[in-house]
């Protein structure tokens, strides 16, 4: 997701 490691 946008704020966690690009997941």
Swiss-Prot record:
Annotated signal sequence range: none
Subcellular location per the Swiss-Prot or TrEMBL entry: Secreted
Predominant location category: secreted
Keywords assigned: Amidation, Neuropeptide, Secreted
GO BP term, example: neuropeptide signaling pathway
Annotated GO CC locations: extracellular region
Modified residues (Leucine amide): 7
Family of the protein in this entry: Belongs to the allatostatin family.
Function: May act as a neurotransmitter or neuromodulator.
Name under which the protein is recorded: Carcinustatin-4
């Amino acid at each position: 997701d946008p704020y966690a490691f690009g997941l």
